[in-house]
Swiss-Prot record:
UniProt cofactor(s): FMN
Annotated GO biological process: coenzyme A biosynthetic process; hyperosmotic salinity response
Keyword Flavoprotein: yes
Protein's name in the database: Phosphopantothenoylcysteine decarboxylase
Source species: Arabidopsis thaliana
Xref: PANTHER family: HOMO-OLIGOMERIC FLAVIN CONTAINING CYS DECARBOXYLASE FAMILY, PHOSPHOPANTOTHENOYLCYSTEINE DECARBOXYLASE
Induction of the gene: Induced by salt stress.
């Protein structure tokens, strides 16, 4: 009798879908001050880990992140590896994540991705990314930087990789200018990613609406 009860419990556990694993990343834009808010948006729905670049740390407050979110920096890439055979952090994070969301995406990191550069933890993850899994970017930069011809070329490169753009919005920017280039609000980024994920899951299960 006890064994039958345990078997039923095991079946219930096995049929419970796990939460999506979302890797959130911030690069060096003043919009990184909203990164803690972004993490909070995702934590109830998904299992979240965070990666930040060195320059983003000038803007974001580590204490603003939810306690359950593990934060990784460039230093962790090297401190976690001592010898051949040890886990490589950017590979482990790429394997762990179901979805990667870069918000904010700075002009500098945009250029690095488009050029295939991998000189920090975040860009190494992107270079090693499995593009059968979704990757979203939410750019944030000055209006003139956003309108620069290089930006258009870089965005085309991202589109060819299958990266999904969450476009910036028009508002008063941190520099005082008014125009396009502000990062989309964290709530919009969250809803965009969740809607995409749930629509993909719906298609895979053969559901119809």
């Amino acid at each position: 009798m006890e064994n039958g009860k345990r078997d039923r419990q095991d079946m219930e556990v096995n049929t419970t879908p796990r939460k999506p694993r979302v890797l959130l990343a911030a690069s060096g834009s003043v919009a990184a001050i909203k990164f803690g808010n972004l993490c909070h948006c995702f934590t109830e729905w998904a299992e979240v880990r965070a990666v930040v670049t060195k320059s983003s740390l000038h803007f974001l407050d580590k204490l603003s992140l939810p306690q359950e979110v593990t934060l990784y920096t460039d230093e962790d890439e090297w401190s976690s590896w001592n010898k051949i055979g040890d886990p490589v952090l950017h590979i482990e994070l790429r394997r762990w994540a179901d979805v990667l969301v870069i918000a904010p995406l700075s002009a500098n990191t945009l250029g690095k991705i488009a050029g295939g550069l991998c000189d920090n933890l975040l860009t190494c993850i992107i270079r090693a990314w499995d593009y059968t899994k979704p990757l979203f970017v939410a750019p944030a930069m000055n209006t003139l930087m956003w309108n620069n011809p290089f930006t258009e070329r870089h965005l085309l490169s991202l589109d060819e990789l299958g990266i999904t753009l969450i476009p910036p919005i028009k508002k008063r920017l941190a520099c005082g200018d008014y125009g396009n280039g502000a990062m989309a609000e964290p709530s919009l980024i969250y809803s965009t990613v969740r809607l995409f994920w749930e629509s993909q899951a719906h298609q895979q299960t053969g559901g119809t609406s």
